[in-house]
A protein has these predicted regions:
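Donor-sugar nucleotide-binding helix/loop cap in glycosyltransferases
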Residues: 1-181
Length: 181
């Protein structure tokens, strides 16, 4: 199996990104293929790539060849019934899809399905993930920098940290911290 690391461009999923992405894909299936995804989403180009990645990794969007982007069945339901992802159940659905997606979110898959530890350091997690992912990597070397970036993003998505001098314009808070994982 090919593993996927760092598709998120080192951006943890932020508050508002899923609903913004769902709305833009629903309105225009070519939003990511016409090279104006960043403008349409009102973010930088790497953030637009990250939003695209998160929508696909969480199985809220797919990109069939020659069709552009389209919402999956669950993406359509979430967009229709909980457009702003205010219901924690919508976040749980996304989390379950992400944690089960070994193809696009390999580190999340390994962390939530192959590892059973309560306490760890980043270095511990790095070593454990290397051990778990090496057999999945089909004899290819695992780029340690990419794995470190995945670990940082994964932890930033689920850990609720108190931020000093919080600036709402930065909006780096991930909605998944409220899952309490």
């Amino acid at each position: 199996m090919a593993i996927k690391l760092k598709g998120h461009e080192t951006f943890a999923l932020r508050e508002g990104w899923l609903n913004k992405g769902l709305a833009k894909v629903d309105a225009n299936p070519k939003v990511f293929s016409e090279n104006y995804g960043a403008d349409a989403l009102g973010v930088g180009s790497n953030m637009a790539k990250a939003i695209r990645y998160w929508l696909k990794a969480g199985k809220f969007m797919e990109e069939p060849p020659k069709e552009g982007a389209k919402l999956t069945d669950i993406g359509q339901i979430i967009f229709k019934e909980d457009k702003y992802l205010e219901d924690i159940f919508s976040l749980w659905i996304f989390h379950i899809n992400l944690a089960g997606n070994e193809k696009l979110a390999t580190s999340w898959y390994a962390f939530f399905n192959l590892i059973n530890i309560d306490e760890f350091s980043k270095e511990d997690l790095m070593n454990i993930l290397l051990e778990k992912l090496t057999p999945l990597a089909e004899k290819k070397a695992i780029p340690e920098r990419s794995l470190r970036d995945d670990i940082s993003v994964l932890l930033n998505m689920y850990v609720k940290e108190k931020q000093q001098n919080y600036d709402p314009e930065e909006n780096k808070i991930s909605p998944f911290a409220q899952l309490g994982l």
